[in-house]
């Protein structure tokens, strides 16, 4: 069950020299505490939709599971803000220090956890996908068209997964990492192969977002914004094509340009 993503409130708006009373929509920020095998694992600040996909994708991106079948049971109690997960295996000692973490909607995890765990889980892409410039531009246009809640609030991150021609699904969330985890969970639940897929993302490609793409296993990530220097380094090391500044019929290729073919 999903709670309301948007809420309305009466506000005062200044416009054209006047203060006007009106109603505005804003996004819901929902804390979801994930308990794994009876132990508190993390609290994720998220938009309260597709929460089962979020939990599955989050656990996979943390390396707690590798496939959906490793989850024996998963129950969402959205009235209290808990996800109760029972795995078919123990988590192991390497997760002991990472329990009870707060994953905020605005940022990623601490640098310590990023280097200790995230980089170890990231996979070097073996993707054979190739794309034309037209496909790149069309995918970003498609993401912007699908981002209905962002148009209403300006407060959500958007992500989609595609084979270059067709969108398989898109997700929106107050947290940029959550949008990708929801897509990851969607693919795991439906056993969708991701090696030759593309991630389309509304935000900046940071090192953490690039690592998230590597964990998911895609070979290409697209964004309307620019990547960071560490993200470019990681993209080159992990054989991922990172493309940014997709706007007005142009884009920049920052790593592994061999996947983009100029001929239409």
Swiss-Prot record:
Single GO cellular component term: cytoplasm
Recorded superkingdom: Bacteria
SUPFAM superfamilies in alphabetical order: Cytidine deaminase-like
Transmembrane segments: none
GO function term, MF aspect, one: sulfurtransferase activity
Cell compartments where the protein resides: Cytoplasm
Record InterPro entries: Cytidine_deaminase-like, FdhD
Major localisation: cytoplasm
Active site (record annotation): 107
GO annotation, biological process: Mo-molybdopterin cofactor biosynthetic process
Keywords linked to the UniProt accession: Cytoplasm, Molybdenum cofactor biosynthesis
Role: Required for formate dehydrogenase (FDH) activity. Acts as a sulfur carrier protein that transfers sulfur from IscS to the molybdenum cofactor prior to its insertion into FDH.
Family affiliation: Belongs to the FdhD family.
Protein name from the UniProt record: Sulfur carrier protein FdhD
Organism of provenance: Staphylococcus haemolyticus (strain JCSC1435)
Lineage of the species this protein comes from: Bacteria, Bacillati, Bacillota, Bacilli, Bacillales
